[in-house]
């Protein structure tokens, strides 16, 4: 994959041949070379989605330890997000705050947005190259994520929703398998998780170094001044549902947070949706987000290891 800002996902249409010809070995090649592939004009029907996903995602994963609000709609198929339509979701790699992240994502458009609603995608190498040397140096030792998950009543997601489990022992087994993770059960029944993760990673096949963290999404500065101030009146930063610092616990300069967010969005290419479209993404090479929209929009997502 190129590190320049001219990157764009590959696009496959019926003129390139039958859909099934592109969903196995050819797709593997395209994802390594281009990072993301859009399939347009094939008219994939909701009734045929499972068959397509079985080819694209060889081992579909449940959305365990995910922080985005989503709903199940099928066998390890979810709504892409349920954040309010008027909000922009900044660029990120799925579960990059975790020691376990999906290798591949598949987004499917069931209902065309009324207006807006594109899924922006960005090369992680281009995003890294767009950041200032000072910022990259500051993040060299990684970041520390803190998650506060309530027990069913509170702000944000519960630990039961996050881990799709009701058994504490099952959650602990999951966390124990993730290096760099500590946790504690709180007196109110909630769960606090701390994880130290790198800010960049190297793709295991291509060797490409990419920006790979969610520091900007987990930092209060990304919420805007009014929202951040309102939350500060309710609870200290370390008790927010999501909080991030540098790996040593020192605070991250809000200016860095805004630089990460803004340069990622500026380098992104919008994938505009039509019903029946499919977008497949290498979750290390390429980050994704969501533009605001009005009217109907239904985009589904599934993941694989």
Mark where each language-model region is.
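Active-site environment of non-heme Fe oxygenases that use a 2-His-1-carboxylate facial triad
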Residues: 1-19, 85-91, 100-278, 284-305
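An N-terminal domain-cap segment
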Residues: 9-33, 39
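Catalytic micro-motifs at enzyme active sites that drive phosphoryl/nucleotidyl and oxygen chemistry
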Residues: 26-27, 90-98
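Glycine-rich loop at the start of a catalytic domain that most often binds anionic cofactors/ligands
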Residues: 44-58
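C-terminal end-helix/capping segment
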Residues: 58-70, 295-305
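A gly/proline- and charged-residue-enriched helix-loop-helix capping module
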Residues: 63-93
């Amino acid at each position: 994959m190129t590190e320049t800002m001219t990157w764009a996902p590959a696009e496959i249409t019926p003129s390139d041949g039958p859909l099934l010809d592109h969903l196995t070995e050819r797709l593997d090649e395209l994802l390594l070379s281009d990072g993301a592939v859009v399939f347009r004009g094939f008219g994939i029907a909701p009734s045929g989605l499972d068959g397509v996903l079985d080819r694209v995602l060889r081992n579909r994963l449940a959305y365990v330890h995910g922080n985005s609000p989503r709903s199940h709609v099928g066998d390890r198929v979810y709504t892409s997000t349920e954040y309010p339509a008027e909000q922009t979701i900044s660029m990120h790699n799925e579960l990059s705050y975790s020691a376990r992240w999906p290798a591949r994502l598949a987004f499917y458009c069931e209902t065309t947005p009324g207006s807006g609603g594109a899924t922006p995608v960005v090369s992680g190498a281009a995003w890294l190259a767009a950041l200032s040397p000072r910022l990259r140096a500051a993040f060299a030792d990684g970041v520390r994520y803190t998650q506060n998950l309530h027990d069913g009543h509170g702000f944000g997601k519960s630990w039961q929703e996050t881990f799709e489990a009701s058994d504490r022992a099952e959650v602990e087994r999951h966390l124990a398998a993730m290096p760099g993770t500590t946790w504690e059960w709180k007196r109110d029944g909630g769960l606090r998780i701390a994880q130290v993760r790198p800010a960049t990673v190297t793709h295991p096949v291509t060797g490409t170094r990419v920006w790979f963290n969610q520091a900007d999404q987990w930092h209060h500065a990304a919420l805007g001044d009014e929202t951040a101030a309102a939350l500060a009146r309710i609870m200290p930063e370390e008790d927010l549902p999501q909080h991030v610092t540098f790996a040593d616990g020192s605070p991250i300069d809000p200016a860095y947070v805004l630089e990460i967010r803004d340069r990622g969005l500026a380098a992104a290419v919008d994938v505009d949706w039509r019903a029946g479209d499919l977008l497949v993404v290498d979750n290390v090479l390429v980050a994704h987000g969501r533009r605001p929209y009005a009217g109907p929009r239904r985009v589904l997502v599934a993941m694989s290891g």
